[in-house]
Amino acid sequence: MIKSPSSLEKTNLAPALSQVSSDYDSVRALILKALAVIRSDNFDEYFDLFSEDAIWMMPSKYSDVNKAGARNFYRFTAKFRFDQTTSIDELVVADDWAFVRVSFDGYLRPKFEDGSPPLRSVSRHIWILKRELDGSWKIARDIWNNPRDLG
C-alpha cells in the first residue's frame, strides 16, 4: 500500500516513487468519484469516467458492449437509483494501467414513489483503467458478475 499524501510530505522520495504515489492517488480519486456518481441521481455522469473505447463484459453475455450499449443497458437508472454499500477489495497501479476489484451490495430503489418495491442488487466488478494521452485516468473495461451466493 502506498503511503497517504500527508505522510509522503515528511519523507524524501525518489521521483519514480513519487509518481507512483501520484498515480495511485489519481486512480483512487477516480474510483471514489465513480462510486459516488453510481449512488447519485445523476447516473449519466458515470459514463464520463470511461474512455471512449470502453468495453463492458456483462454477466451471462457472450458479446461485449461499448459505451452506447452500456448507456442503453443502464437506462433503468432514469427510474431507479442504486442504494448500495461498496467495498474496494483491491487497487493496483502499474505504469499506464490500473485495476480495481470492487463489490456492490444493496438495492435498486425507485426514484419516484410508485409503489414499486426495492430490487436486490449485488455485483462484483473488475475495472481496468488506463492513462489517457492527456495524463488523466479513465475506466477502460468493466468486467462484472452477479453472484448467486450472496455470502
Labelled PLM ranges:
Residues 107-119, 148-149:
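Short, cysteine-centered beta-strand-loop-beta hairpins and adjacent loop/turn segments enriched
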Residues 93-96, 133-135:
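Short strand-connecting beta-turns/loops that link adjacent beta-strands
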Residues 1-52, 93, 150-151:
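Short, low-complexity N-terminal intrinsically disordered segments enriched in polar/charged residues
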Residues 99-105, 124-128:
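Beta-strand secondary-structure signal
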Residues 29-30, 83-86, 124:
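Short, conserved clusters of charged catalytic residues that mark active-site
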Residues 2-15, 120-151:
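Short beta-strand edge/turn micro-motifs at domain boundaries
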Residues 43-94, 103, 107, 119:
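A solvent-exposed, acidic/Ser-Thr-rich amphipathic alpha-helical stretch
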